[in-house]
């Protein structure tokens, strides 16, 4: 409702593990000490610096795996898997993904409220 910006990322020839290695190498080159490293600092050195972590990641082709994609940034993302291949992914498929996403309870790593209520 209050969202005014949409970020859409398309990644080609990208690997999340390689991105993390590049970030670590850059920190070492700049002389950053181990005790200075924290989540915010690592975020700064990633390719996605300055962008919010994704809320929703759509995986096409029917594969049920993350394929080394945004492995740092996707920690609390919601995933939607569709059998459609990327060239066939259209407005209707996007609508399905967004409807599915809108029905989810975003927990950001926390337990569901149904699991934390005392009985």
Predicted segments with their positions:
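Flexible, compositionally biased loop and terminal segments
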Residues: 1-119
């Amino acid at each position: 409702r209050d969202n005014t910006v949409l970020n859409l990322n398309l990644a080609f020839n990208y690997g999340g593990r390689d991105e993390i290695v590049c970030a670590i190498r850059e920190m070492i080159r700049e002389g950053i000490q181990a005790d200075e490293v924290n989540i915010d600092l690592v975020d700064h050195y990633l390719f996605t610096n300055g962008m919010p972590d994704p809320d929703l990641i759509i995986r096409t082709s029917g594969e049920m795996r993350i394929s080394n994609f945004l492995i740092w940034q996707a920690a609390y993302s919601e995933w939607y898997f569709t059998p459609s291949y990327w060239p066939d992914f259209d407005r209707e498929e996007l609508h399905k993904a967004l409807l599915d996403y809108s029905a989810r309870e975003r927990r950001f790593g926390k337990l569901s409220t149904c699991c934390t209520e005392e009985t």
